[in-house]
Amino acid sequence: MARIVFMGTPDFSVPVLQTLITEGYEVVGVVTQPDRPKGRKRVLTPPPVKVEALKHGIPVLQPEKVRLDEEIDKVLALKPDLIVTAAFGQILPKRLLDEPQFGCINVHASLLPELRGGAPIHYAILQGKKKTGVTIMYMVERLDAGDMISKVEVEIDELDNVGTLHDKLSVAGAALLKDTVPNVLSGSISPIPQNEDAATYAPNIKREQERLDWTKTGEELYNQVRGLNPWPVAYTEWNGAHLKVWEAKKVPLEVQEEAGKVIELQKEGPVIGTGNKQGLLLTGVQPAGKKKMSGEDFLRGANIEIGQKLGLMNEEK
């Protein structure tokens, strides 16, 4: 029986680990990120993969930097024949890549070579894609650039956000791994090199990408809202303070209205003008210092009127 070390950190990785366990593979160790403070109270919280591993009595390593020699030694002491990674969050050093008999394979949430990097699910929606998927590939020292072993496509629904698409891809990735690992161990695969000319990237989301630019089209703004939900969440400014926008709908308009202006008050919330003949209906928002609420509740409690402008800081008023 091949000895497998699994490396992963967030919720996306958990079904992948569960698949290895339920399929009866000998998972001799799990490597994940250190516990981190979470929430307003900054409570030290273990990664989801650690929680799952401990349920099954699997030893857990939590290196701050897996590339350090002493951390590499700890992983190799587990004598892995195969390393499987999924959203681990660190690039593996050459010693780890070279040691296992069957190499290191990674479950990546995109159709490589598109969307290499740490936020492929976000970018799939931000870019308005109609489909994405999961690729399993051999790991190399470059980011998500190894030869591809298997792929599966996943449709992106018009109503998907990062949370719902994440769950679809996590399940699809686990199922793909179930079919792929036996072929890797038996050597019955024909890995395909990636086309470097077709490579695109999905780096981690930056703060400036969260702010809604009302001069963009309604479609772009709609994709931005769902492409940042449930994390880190798009925002605009209202009355000089941040207003998070969790959910929205596109509204067709007969004429193009002023970008950022409140042009209509519907039952579900305010409609805001954009950079084309579409309005953006804000159906789920979170004013500064308050809890998330429906657009309807926001209208009921806020003094918002037709003609007001969103996206202005105090100094711009």
UniProtKB/Swiss-Prot annotation:
It catalyses: L-methionyl-tRNA(fMet) + (6R)-10-formyltetrahydrofolate = N-formyl-L-methionyl-tRNA(fMet) + (6S)-5,6,7,8-tetrahydrofolate + H(+). The keyword Transferase applies. SUPFAM superfamilies: FMT C-terminal domain-like (SSF50486), Formyltransferase (SSF53328). (6S)-5,6,7,8-tetrahydrofolate binds at residues 110-113. It is an enzyme of class 2 (transferase). Disulfide bonds: none annotated. InterPro entries: Fmt (IPR005794), Formyl_trans_C (IPR005793), Formyl_trans_C_sf (IPR037022), Formyl_transf_N (IPR002376), Formyl_transf_N_sf (IPR036477), Formyl_transferase-like_C_sf (IPR011034), GART_AS (IPR001555), Met-tRNA-FMT_C (IPR044135). One of its GO terms (molecular function) is methionyl-tRNA formyltransferase activity. Its EC number is 2.1.2.9. One of its GO terms (cellular component) is cytosol. Pfam families: Formyl_trans_C, Formyl_trans_N. Keywords: Protein biosynthesis, Transferase. The keyword Protein biosynthesis applies. Attaches a formyl group to the free amino group of methionyl-tRNA(fMet). The formyl group appears to play a dual role in the initiator identity of N-formylmethionyl-tRNA by promoting its recognition by IF2 and preventing the misappropriation of this tRNA by the elongation apparatus. Belongs to the Fmt family. This is Methionyl-tRNA formyltransferase. It comes from Bacillus pumilus (strain SAFR-032).
